[in-house]
């Protein structure tokens, strides 16, 4: 393999890695949807003060997207979250994941 071939392969691999890590979500749209749908339980920034409701801030995008898709499809059972996720579009889910992922996570404390 020549140096030119190696360079081409390296550039292609880097481009694919960057594309795979790129988010399809929109932060501002996610913020608006979070305020509308999620903030009452999870807090406006995803740092819920109620121990029964999980903190969403700082979570990985892919985890948040999968959880919401699974609540929506019924693969993940929760009588509170299923109806909350049901009306969300694919884009809503990506936007929410982008927004909550970008929020700084607060430390959980026991009281």
Regions found by a protein language model. Give the residues of each.
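Bacterial N-terminal signal peptides that target proteins for export
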Residues: 1-10
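Conserved amphipathic alpha-helical interaction elements at protein-protein interfaces in regulatory
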Residues: 3, 47, 70-73, 102, ...
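C-terminal capping alpha-helices of c-type cytochrome domains
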Residues: 14, 76, 86-111
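N-terminal signal peptide c-region/cleavage motif recognized by signal peptidases
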Residues: 17-20
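Sequence/structural segment immediately N-terminal to covalent heme-attachment motifs in c-type
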Residues: 25-45, 59, 108-111
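Gly/Gly-Pro-rich "capping" loops immediately C-terminal to redox-active cysteine motifs
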Residues: 27, 31, 46-73, 82-87
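C-type cytochrome heme c attachment motif
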Residues: 35-44, 54-55, 66-69, 94-98
């Amino acid at each position: 393999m020549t140096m030119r071939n190696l360079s081409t392969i390296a550039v292609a691999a880097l481009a694919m890695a960057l594309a795979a890590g790129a988010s399809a979500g929109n932060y501002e749209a996610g913020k608006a949807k979070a305020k509308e749908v999620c903030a009452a339980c999870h807090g406006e920034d995803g740092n819920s003060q109620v121990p029964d409701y999980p903190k969403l801030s700082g979570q990985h995008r892919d985890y948040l997207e999968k959880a919401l898709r699974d609540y929506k499809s019924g693969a993940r059972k929760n009588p509170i979250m299923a109806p909350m996720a049901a009306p969300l579009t694919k884009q809503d889910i990506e936007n929410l994941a982008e927004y909550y992922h970008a929020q700084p996570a607060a430390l959980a404390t026991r009281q």
